[in-house]
Structures are given as structure tokens and as C-alpha cells.
């Protein structure tokens, strides 16, 4: 039986095959020809000027009203929530809690348990969420910056209203008819112990307060630039998601790349170190043009690792590689605007004109 080649061996093989020297990305290099490869996805081309119209995102503290419900007057307070938040309360009950708005009795019973439960950690979680999100000045500023930059690119898109809520570990972000929501109890830190009961370890990386703005913007982009069901090949999915990541990075100019994609710094460094090997493995297996759902899910969906590449890799490597290709495409075609990029649906053309050769 032919031994399974490790990613590291594949990496070395691909470099040897191309007659080049293997160099780790975190080494200091003096070879000018490699500079373009080493600068990563931080495309510094100025697509959005500094002097743009500022927009103010309205943040509604529904979470505070939720947690002000009193155990001895739950029904009365729930009725008041419907009156005070008639726009959002039905969305919250049906979309987040998956209950009928007409079933007030069950909602009150569930809410009583939600306020006092200590087994699942709801009471402790609610208290911590209130404390961590007591001051949202930084969140407000970051949202204003992100949506101001997006408004410059797409002024026809309506700025959403953002509600903060506690979800009972049901939802991180949501979007419905230009109303967005953030489940603040899902952003209490990747080391928050009660998350061990509700999510896998690999999912906890983005359950941090710093990820709220990126998650909101990412969902907003996905809603306004919907996925085309005709994208049935891996290449098309990679380029589509890569374009979304490129746009998201322009809205978060002060965020490092690993935060934009939701990796740890160590995961990002691993990808950069083995980028050539990753690409060689994809090409060697001819995965770019595969349509099998197992292959697509392995590359594009979140998971502990990308099974098609290596158990040492982070998940969603297809997204990461797609972003690298799109970034290379924009670097090598500086006259292309972001609008033109987002309206270019020929994934093969983007790949060819990216000159992506890690």
C-alpha cells in the first residue's frame, strides 16, 4: 500500500518539484521576488477613502429589558415587552426561541426557568453578559465604522437596526427584514466554561466580544449578495466566499486577517507556512472542479480541521484559499473596483488572472 503523504512532505515535494528552496513564511527573507507572496491578504490598495460620510447604527438594548423581567411578575413583564418592542419581540419569540407568539403561558413558564436556572448556567451567563456588555461604546464605534465604509460602497443598502438580546445559547447573530440581532450570551469568551455544554471546541474560537462586528457584517453581506445555487464546483464556491472575505476585510481595516476570517493567530500562521503545500494538495487531487458534497463541505464548512488537507489544518481552508486567490486577483488588476469584483461571476477567469502561485 502506498504510504499516505503528509502535508509537510507534500509541501516539500511541491517545492522540490518546482526547483525551489523550502522557506517557512515566518522567517525573515531578503529575496525581493517573494515579497508579493509574503504580504498575505492585507491588500493596501485604497478602495475606500478616509473622508467618507459617517453613518450611525442604532443599537437597541433589548437585552437589558429582557433581564429586567421579574420572576414574580413574568406574565406582566412579558406583555410589557411585547408593547415596548412590538417590532422585535415577535421575531425574538418565533425566530430565536422557536415558540408561537400566541403561546404566552408556555413562554412565561420557559422564561421563569431561563431567569433562574443554574444547571445550564443561564443565570450565571445572563449576569456575565450584562456585565461584559454594560458599556458598548467600542461596539458602537466599530459598527459605525464598518457600516459607514459599506455605505460608501453600497449607498443603496439600508443601514440595519441592531438589537442586543440574550438567547439562551440559541443564536449568535440574526437578520430579518433589515433588523439584525446579536445574542450577547454567545460572545462571552472562547474559554467560558458553559460553552462546553453547547458547542464543539472548534466553534468557541469566534465566541468572543471582538467577533461581534465581523459576524454582523458578514451576515449582512451574505444577505445582500446571496449565494448562487449554480455554484456547484469547489472553485466557484471558493471564489464566491473569497470575494465576500475580501469585501469584509475592507470594512474592518484595523482588524488582523486572522480575526477577519475567525482563525487564531496560530491557525493563520499554519496556513501561511504551508500555503504552497495546501495548494499543491488541492491541485494534485483535482479538487477544484469536484462537485461532491462531501468534498465541498470539507473545504467550506466549519470544523475542527479540513479533512481533505490535513488533521493539523484549521477548518474552512477553502474559504482561506479563496480569499488568497481573490486578493491576488485584485493585486494584479488594480483597475478593478470592488463592484466589478463582486459582479464578476467567472471563477475560472478570476483564478487565471490572479496569477496565484504560492
Q: What is each residue range found by the language model?
A:
Residues 245-306:
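Acidic/His/Gly-enriched intrinsically disordered linker/tail segments
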